[in-house]
Regions:
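Conserved oxyanion/phosphate-binding beta-strand-loop segments in alpha/beta enzyme cores
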Residues: 1, 105-132, 161, 222-245, ...
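Feature 926 captures the class I aminoacyl-tRNA synthetase adenylation module centered on the KMSKS loop
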Residues: 72, 267-336, 340, 384-427, ...
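Short hydrophobic-aromatic micro-motifs
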Residues: 83-87, 92-101, 141-144, 224-226, ...
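Auxiliary tRNA-acceptor-end handling modules of aminoacyl-tRNA synthetases
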Residues: 88, 213, 222, 228, ...
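Metal-dependent nuclease catalytic cores in nucleic-acid-processing enzymes
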Residues: 150-159, 192, 371-387, 615-623
Length: 677
């Protein structure tokens, strides 16, 4: 981080989520939320990852597409009458507690109120009507299992259906006769084989379907099961409107990312499961009564607590009188910890004066992949605790992908380490290339922009070395009365650059700032202005004119390196120490004031723009005639408008010196340039 120029204020704002003081802060916020009636514990079907062995929140899971099979299975109504149900999960047959059809599906009106026998297991279940059934999927009939997906949970609660758990925490089948103890995949294979033998599978279709997986961890991606477990929850569904209100107040960069959070909030169906069955983490800071479930909070002065090791503040349950009080081995979801970072850095817990001065914080910068976790949970928790949203600005960045356009992964061999770019091209070239990308979008990593960035840095260095021969000669101020047309042009360009770069940086449009700085310094300053002033430095028409040019050089480079500093801090700091520190007096360029328009005289650069255009045309004509730019031209005939001819005559000495022309002849008319040797 140091090598690439990343230097936050570690001394004031560093924190570690594994420290006891951080645990204390996390537990205190949970105590606040408990006192507001927002923490509860209950049995509920939760998203469960059998590989990680823990419950997950809705934000940690997501759908991926995989190939699979859709099995059409016969369910018996009477001895000679069957219906067909299509499912991708025949291993859940033992958990089937009902059959559902769409009430508008005329094909199955006769089934309403009947019972259907579940194949292999023989239990009978009733037929329900529900509008959520898709009549176009499979046969239009679905089996309701406990639990195959979120829809099964909704139906179970809506119709008060029985619960038959058939998958345990290890991902093994239970309560399913001879299939018990098998993995989900093994049980599916065996049940399908038995159904085939019984003639109960009528057809099998290869399909591409969505599977719910543990998507937050790319090294997991295990299919999710729904397991009924005692878990700890925060009431989050109740705060949808408040969170939407807060996100509307924030300045989003890019603006369209706000929609992602909005869509997530509107799709939240369950309260936040905050407990995790892991070894390490912030302990859930509550005890509970084993008999009635009453929650017993710690006293504030007890924090931090580990309820497995520490004694509760009371010996018996205040609700039922039982002395069976237990702690919990569960730890907090990591987002419970991370969601209070704005409170940590603004010292909410220990310095209210500092907190009131610094909260809400200016900026949250993060990736788009954790909008629905870190960002959402931070807004939720901070809003509940402080009654104010945590951020003024939210900047969402994309990901740098591998050169092949896919996510970087060691297994794919497409990982680009920052050290490689720093060693080869320098940190500033790498920073420049990355800041040239548009915020919010993912980009495959390419070396070409880094190489181009290094070329720009080399251009800066060589131009500064040239200019340093002249611009350090004594204290000089720009004399506005002695500016010629091309001086006015470069100063007008400089003012425009300051304005555009400042505006772009304020709006976090770093790619615009990078492009503008390149355009000004490389093309306007180096390619045009420096080439145009060389005769005035080497063969000055007067000492006053030379002094003015040197003052302009000083002004431009001093302003430019301060504009460049946030993007390329290493070269900016180096140039500052070599050329400017003694005169300007700041210990570092980072302490120097950011450039303002007040530093540059306001002048009209229009004539200079036209003059630069003429110079460019003369150069192009040399190239067209296969002449070196330094080759001597006997005579140039410039055909132009009267206005441009007058401009050229005023600057004829400059044109002759810069373009190595002996004589210039002028004609009125449409632009045409002729070179005669």
């Amino acid at each position: 981080m140091i090598r690439i120029g990343y230097r936050p204020d570690w001394e004031q704002f560093e924190y570690r989520t594994m420290d006891k003081n951080y645990w204390k802060a996390v537990q205190y916020t949970l105590l606040i939320m408990y006192e507001k009636g927002l923490i509860y514990r209950k049995k509920f079907p939760v998203h469960w990852c059998s590989k990680c062995g823990t419950a997950l929140s809705q934000a940690e899971v997501g759908y991926i597409q995989k190939r699979g099979k859709l099995y059409y299975i016969k369910f018996r109504i009477t001895d000679n009458e069957f219906i067909e149900i299509a499912t991708t999960r025949p291993e859940l047959l033992s958990a089937c507690v009902a059959i559902a059809i769409n009430p508008n599906d005329e094909r199955y009106k006769n089934l309403i109120g009947k019972e259907v026998e579940v194949p292999i297991f023989g239990n009978k279940v009733r037929v329900l009507e529900d509008n959520a059934v898709d009549p176009n999927f499979g046969t239009g009939i679905v089996m309701i299992c406990t639990y195959g997906d979120e829809q099964d949970i909704r139906w179970q609660q809506r119709y008060n259906l029985p619960i038959i758990p058939v998958i345990n925490e290890e991902g093994k089948i239970i309560n399913s006769g001879k299939y018990s103890g098998m993995s989900v995949i093994e049980a599916r294979k065996e049940i399908v084989e038995d159904l085939r033998k019984l003639g109960l599978i009528t057809r099998e279709e290869e399909i591409l379907h969505n599977i719910l997986v543990h998507i937050e961890r790319s090294d997991c991606m295990t299919p999710i099961e729904f397991i009924v477990k005692d878990q700890w929850f925060i009431k989050s569904k109740d705060f949808k409107e408040e969170i939407i209100e807060e996100e509307e107040k924030m300045n989003w960069i890019p603006k369209y990312m706000k929609q992602r959070l909005l869509e997530w909030i509107n799709n939240i169906e369950w309260d936040w499961v905050i407990s995790r069955q892991r070894i390490f983490g912030t302990p859930i800071p509550f005890w509970y009564c084993e008999d009635c479930g009453f929650i017993i909070p710690p006293k504030k002065e007890q924090l931090p607590v580990d309820t497995i090791k520490d004694k509760p503040p009371i010996n018996s349950c205040p609700k039922c009188g039982s002395n069976k009080i237990s702690g919990t081995s569960d730890v907090c979801d990591c987002w419970v910890d991370s969601s209070i970072t704005p409170l940590i850095i603004t010292r909410f817990f220990e310095d209210k004066t500092f907190f009131n001065r610094t909260y809400p914080v200016d900026l949250r910068q993060q990736g788009h992949d954790i909008i629905r976790t870190w960002l959402y949970y931070t807004i939720l928790r901070c809003k509940i605790i402080t009654e104010v949203g945590p951020f003024k600005n939210v900047v969402i960045n994309g990901h740098i992908l591998g050169p092949d356009g896919t996510r970087m992964s060691k297994s794919k061999g497409n990982v680009i380490m920052p050290e490689e770019g720093i060693e080869k091209y320098g940190a500033d070239a790498l920073r420049q290339a990355l800041l040239s990308l548009t915020l919010g979008s993912d980009f495959p990593f390419k070396w070409e922009p880094v190489r181009h960035g290094k070329s720009f840095l080399q251009k800066i260095w060589s131009s500064v070395r040239f200019a340093s021969q002249f611009m350090m000669n004594g204290e000089k101020k720009i004399n506005i009365t002695q500016l010629n047309d091309i001086d006015k042009w470069i100063l007008a360009k400089l003012r425009n650059t300051i304005a555009i770069v400042d505006d772009a940086m304020e709006k976090y449009q770093f790619h615009i700032a990078v492009e503008m700085l390149k355009q000004f310094y490389w093309h306007d300053f180096c390619d045009q202005y420096i080439e145009a002033i060389k005769p005035r430095l080497y063969s000055p028409i007067s000492q006053d004119d030379k002094d003015n040019v040197e003052a302009i050089l000083y002004k431009i480079i001093w302003i430019f390196i301060r504009l460049l500093n946030p993007i390329c801090p290493h070269i900016a700091e180096e140039i500052y120490h070599r050329l400017f520190k003694e005169r300007e007096g700041y210990i570092s360029i980072n302490i120097a004031p950011y450039p303002s328009l007040d530093e540059v005289p306001e002048v009209d650069g229009n004539n200079g723009e036209k003059l630069v255009d003429i110079i460019a045309s003369l150069r192009s004509k040399k190239v067209e005639n296969r002449m070196a730019l330094s080759a001597l031209v006997k005579k140039a005939i410039i055909q132009e408008s009267k206005e441009i001819i007058e401009l050229c005559k005023r600057n004829e000495w400059l044109l002759k010196e810069v373009l190595h022309i002996n004589e210039i002849e002028y004609k009125e008319g449409r632009r045409e340039i002729t070179l005669i040797n």
